[in-house]
C-alpha cells in the first residue's frame, strides 16, 4: 500500500487529521441579542469560564456590547492558542 495523501486514501472518508486541523482557524465567534446588558454580561462570564477551562495558553477574549432596538447585542471572539482548543470549546457549547 502506498503512502496516502489528502487527495487519495485507500479507505473511504479517511484522511490525516493534520489536513483538517492546521491551526489556521483558532478563533470561535459568538453573537446574540439579550433583553438587557446584565443578561449579556452573565453569558460573557459563563463563556469566559468555559474558554478558560480548555485553554493551554491564555485565550484572547474580545467582547463587544452594542445597544439595539430590541436589546443588547453581545459579540465575542475567542482566540485560542491552537485549533484543537477552539474545537473543544465549540463542542462543549453544544
Curated annotation (Swiss-Prot):
Annotated Gene3D superfamilies: 3.30.70.860
Gene Ontology CC terms, in alphabetical order: cytosol
PANTHER family: UPF0381 PROTEIN YFCZ-RELATED
Family stated for the protein in its record: Belongs to the UPF0381 family.
Protein name: UPF0381 protein YfcZ
Organism the protein comes from: Escherichia coli (strain K12)
Gene this chain is encoded by: yfcZ
Amino acid at each position: 500500500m502506498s503512502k496516502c495523501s489528502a487527495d487519495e486514501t485507500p479507505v473511504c472518508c479517511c484522511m490525516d487529521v493534520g489536513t483538517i486541523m492546521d491551526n489556521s482557524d483558532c478563533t470561535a465567534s459568538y453573537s446574540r441579542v439579550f433583553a438587557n446588558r446584565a443578561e449579556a454580561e452573565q453569558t460573557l462570564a459563563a463563556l469566559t469560564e468555559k474558554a478558560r477551562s480548555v485553554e493551554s495558553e491564555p485565550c484572547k477574549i474580545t467582547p463587544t456590547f452594542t445597544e439595539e432596538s430590541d436589546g443588547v447585542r453581545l459579540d465575542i471572539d475567542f482566540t485560542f492558542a491552537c485549533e484543537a482548543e477552539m474545537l473543544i470549546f465549540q463542542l462543549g457549547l453544544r
